[in-house]
Amino acid sequence: MTLNIQRQAPEQSEIMVANNTVANTQQKRLSIGIVGGGIGGVAFAVALSRDSHLDVQLFEAAPQFSEIGAGVSFGPNAVKAIQRLGLEASYQRIADSSPAPFEDVWFEWRRGSDDAYLTASLAPGVGQSSVHRADFLDAIVGNLPEGIAHFGKRCVEVKQDADSATAYFDDGTHFTGDVIIGFDGIKSAVRR
């Protein structure tokens, strides 16, 4: 069974050729399948879906978005990546962070015997912050365009040839695209 994904019509552009005539060309959108609807997969899908030259589809094994676990702290580079993905507002709404005047402190070292201050690692502009995994996933899912998330799609195999890659799901459907990207966890079918 084939998963029918509706794709937008290709963009058209005009090109001037040598004899001053105008030729219409169609630009093919790169088709991307993302397997895994956790924080990484959803964040990447949100970021890629902002590019009009990409047709992004997200496949999640669960019947809905859900995340387990507790709090997670993001280091300075992770917070900068969140900013570059355009998810900073979603992150800041739910993140706990250090209050002034310690907002740039990432980590502080103290002596165990008397709690005397030793040193600190600074991360100007990002500091130390943390979120609950489920809250962060809920916040970034709100940025995901309608119609690109598909649930109940547990990937069991990926095959590729010179022109495309195909993800096969345990419900008998499959998705063929230009690229398949795996965010499907430790038992990744994409990685195999």
Sequence positions of predicted segments:
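Generic structural signal for small/hydrophobic residues in well-ordered secondary structure
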Residues: A43-A45, E60, I82, I140, ...
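Beta1/beta-strand and adjacent pyrophosphate-binding region of the FAD-binding site
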Residues: A23-G40
